[in-house]
């Protein structure tokens, strides 16, 4: 295979990509905008008093995954009790919703209150993964108890709650 010299080097910041010129020429000929809103400043972009509303519930995500594997080999009289507590997520989400409601009612300026509430809800994303693997081999008369309590989710949302209270006190 024969190598050929390149006129463009990716690591050289002064070297223009060969397709840049072709794409710029293509855009000049194809792009014609007759939009009164974006080009002439007669719409949302030209209005300094415009308020962009966002969907408040779009980023309120809670995800918990538990994967537990218990392998018992060549054993007898084994008692296994496994508890997985994930109900705390819905309680914590309700707590976060209460904080957002308190934020909306405590800030006098409606626009600022909505922006703070949107920011709080956009930061409410919790993810927790718990994997356990337990191997019991050549054993007799063993009692095993596993408890999976997703406390990290509670701590994460408690931090969001403290930040929300701090923001409310700074704004007021």
Curated annotation (Swiss-Prot):
Supply the alphabetized keyword list.
Sporulation
InterPro entries, per the entry: Spore_coat_X/V
Coiled-coil segments, which residues?
Answer: none
Chief place where the protein resides? other
Q: Does the keyword Membrane apply?
A: no
Subcellular location, record wording: Spore coat
Taxonomic source organism: Bacillus subtilis (strain 168)
Record-level GO cellular component terms:
spore wall
Which GO biological process annotations does it have? Answer: sporulation resulting in formation of a cellular spore
Name the chain's protein.
Answer: Spore coat protein X
Its taxonomic path starts at:
Bacteria, Bacillati, Bacillota, Bacilli, Bacillales
Q: Which pairs are disulfide-linked?
A: none
Q: Name one Pfam family in it.
A: Coat_X
């Amino acid at each position: 295979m024969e190598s050929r010299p390149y006129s463009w080097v990716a690591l050289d910041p002064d070297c223009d990509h060969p397709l840049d010129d072709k794409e710029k020429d293509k855009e000049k000929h194809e792009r014609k905008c007759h939009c009164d809103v974006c080009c002439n400043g007669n719409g949302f972009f030209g209005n300094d008093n415009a308020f962009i509303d966002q969907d408040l519930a779009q980023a309120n995500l809670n995800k918990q995954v538990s994967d537990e594997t218990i392998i018992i080999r060549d054993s007898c009289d084994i008692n296994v009790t496994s508890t997985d507590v994930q109900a705390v997520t819905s309680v914590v989400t309700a707590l976060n919703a209460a904080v957002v409601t308190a934020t909306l009612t405590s800030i006098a300026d409606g626009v600022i209150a909505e922006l703070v509430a949107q920011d709080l809800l956009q930061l409410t994303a919790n993810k927790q993964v718990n994997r356990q693997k337990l191997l019991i081999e050549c054993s007799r008369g063993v009692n095993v108890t596993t408890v999976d309590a997703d406390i990290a989710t509670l701590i994460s949302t408690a931090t969001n709650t403290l930040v929300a209270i701090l923001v409310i006190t700074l704004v007021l």
